[in-house]
Amino acid sequence: MGRSPCCEKEHMNKGAWTKEEDERLVSYIKSHGEGCWRSLPRAAGLLRCGKSCRLRWINYLRPDLKRGNFTHDEDELIIKLHSLLGNKWSLIAARLPGRTDNEIKNYWNTHIKRKLLSKGIDPATHRGINEAKISDLKKTKDQIVKDVSFVTKFEETDKSGDQKQNKYIRNGLVCKEERVVVEEKIGPDLNLELRISPPWQNQREISTCTASRFYMENDMECSSETVKCQTENSSSISYSSIDISSSNVGYDFLGLKTRILDFRSLEMK
């Protein structure tokens, strides 16, 4: 449930205040004090809203209000207070006797802000504009380095389970190691000789190759590793490996180095 309105809006005067209304308001407050602004208009014989009476008194009719332009000392004090308090105009006005928060806010937006910008000072941070940009850039860079430092090695497996990726941190950069498993089933050669011999035993040879390579992720090249192959049959298991650090190096359309590995060049033992 919201707050009830301060007065009925029907049969209320709106717009500029007349001299007679100002005199009634000043006379009543001098005699009875400010009191409750809700009941004050009716007691003073004014067809005005309580909020309108309060703003009229605070901003225009108070006897301690200062008239005229802001002085140089007031300008310096407003700038100093704004650097400490920000846009809290009521707190700033409390430290400038005779000035209202609305008056100070309008003066800030129309005069002081332009004055600071002409001197190359950011009105929001009260620092040099170039200095603020450099500081923001440094914060962004520090945040990126901080995010990278928290990266740990983890392993990702795709849906088929044949491809795995490991991430490492090398010299502050993220490198990815990709492992591709290639499995090849090799059956026996077809024997076309017709002769009587014992039944052929169903032997199957399986070759599995795992290629590990590092590729670039942060505009720097990461080192490559080796390819390991394993050949299995019913009688024995053999292993072979090849170094791909000297494999073909190419460039993609972005100018990034890529390494090409031809699995056909591997010799299965």
From Swiss-Prot:
Intracellular or extracellular location(s): Nucleus
Ranges of the DNA-binding region feature: 37-61, 89-112
Induction: Induced by abscisic acid (ABA) and osmotic stress. Induced by salt stress.
CDD domains: SANT
Protein's GO biological process: regulation of flavonol biosynthetic process
Source organism: Arabidopsis thaliana
Known role: Transcription factor involved in the negative regulation of flavonol biosynthesis. Represses the early phenylpropanoid genes, phenylalanine ammonia-lyase (PAL), cinnamate 4-hydroxylase (C4H) and 4-coumarate-CoA ligase (4CL), as well as the flavonoid-specific genes, flavonoid 3'-hydroxylase (F3'H) and dihydroflavonol 4-reductase (DFR). Plays a role in seed germination inhibition. Negatively regulates the expression of the abscisic acid (ABA) signaling transcription factor ABI5 in seeds.
GO molecular function annotations of the record: DNA-binding transcription factor activity; transcription cis-regulatory region binding
Cross-referenced Pfam families: Myb_DNA-binding
Keyword terms, alphabetized: DNA-binding, Nucleus, Repeat, Repressor, Transcription, Transcription regulation
Main location: nucleus
Name of the molecule in the record: Transcription factor MYB7
Cellular component aspect of the GO annotation: nucleus
Subunit composition and interactions: Interacts with SAD2.
Domain (HTH myb-type): residue spans on this chain: 9-61, 62-116
Deletion consequences: No visible phenotype under normal growth conditions. Increased levels of flavonols. Decreased levels of anthocyanins.
Entry keyword Coiled coil: no
Tissues in which the protein is found: Expressed in anthers. Expressed in pollen grains and mature seeds. Expressed in roots and vasculature of leaves.
Family annotation (PANTHER family): F14D16.11-RELATED (PTHR47994:SF5)
